[in-house]
């Protein structure tokens, strides 16, 4: 924790010097692309965006009658640009109940350097494996893991590697990636390969991927993942199919199917979820059913930096029964806070 405070102190001083001395000169032309939309931006902001995300609350496991107040996680985010073409992104778990080891780089979800030119990008560093699932793609503190699949809880997604992106049209991304294999068990010369497509239209969004995860020399586990999100006014519906295996039986022996409808309004969101799963994982070789429902509320009119939530779930593999999660998530933008402080001096 002392290292964190030292780091934040240095970061604050660096931001302060940049804000006070170079605020006007910190803008320059940029060709910028996101995962789904390669588009031109007129300016680039060299001041890093530093923020903290936190979530905590009360959880009640009804199967074991075990209830307690707890903190779900404290995350540090740093994003910025080194030049008009080079950007970086950093997300680190200062504390988290979702992972057993948060020390050193084990506590880093991603640490990437990206070079963008035209409709192409190259990214190197630690990143999430491309996997076509909106359940998997959600941020840790935006996900209620007690209503998620067994695969979500057991897949070691954060890996070192390199990836490339091609953005042929607005809202379209073709992504390729090579990383260390999540099935390597710590051994070298075992790699994972991913080819993904993300598309976005007014009424539909896709995230599909084909994956190979090497577990021995010349031996791979294959995976096909089809994430689909439909937009119907204020309603969204996620429909996902994921399958894994080493032979043609993968489509019936190891798979996950999920449906998640949601309704969103100005100051809140309500959602439900239903999933069926069959897995050949060594620790849990069985079928699983998981269901849940919840609501999120945003008490601030000007932004969504504070979120209240209540979520119920039933997950046979996770708790063997019902679970209730009540809590709050909040975001503190340290860069904006320092800018406002300096503007008053």
Put a short name on every predicted segment.
Residues 1-4:
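Positively charged n-region of N-terminal signal peptides that target proteins for export
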Residues 8-16:
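Bacterial N-terminal signal peptides
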Residues 15, 87-88, 93-94, 155-156, ...:
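A structural preference for long, well-packed, hydrophobic secondary-structure segments
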Residues 20-122, 164-172, 309-313, 322-345:
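Beta-barrel outer-membrane channel/assembly domains of diderm bacteria
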Residues 23-27, 51-63, 99-101, 121-198, ...:
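Surface-exposed coil loops of outer-membrane beta-barrel proteins
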Residues 24, 47, 55-65, 100-101, ...:
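Outer-membrane beta-barrel pore domains
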Residues 53, 70-74, 106-110, 157-161, ...:
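Transmembrane beta-barrel architecture of outer-membrane proteins
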Residues 105, 181-185, 292-294:
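Short, electropositive alpha-helical surface patch
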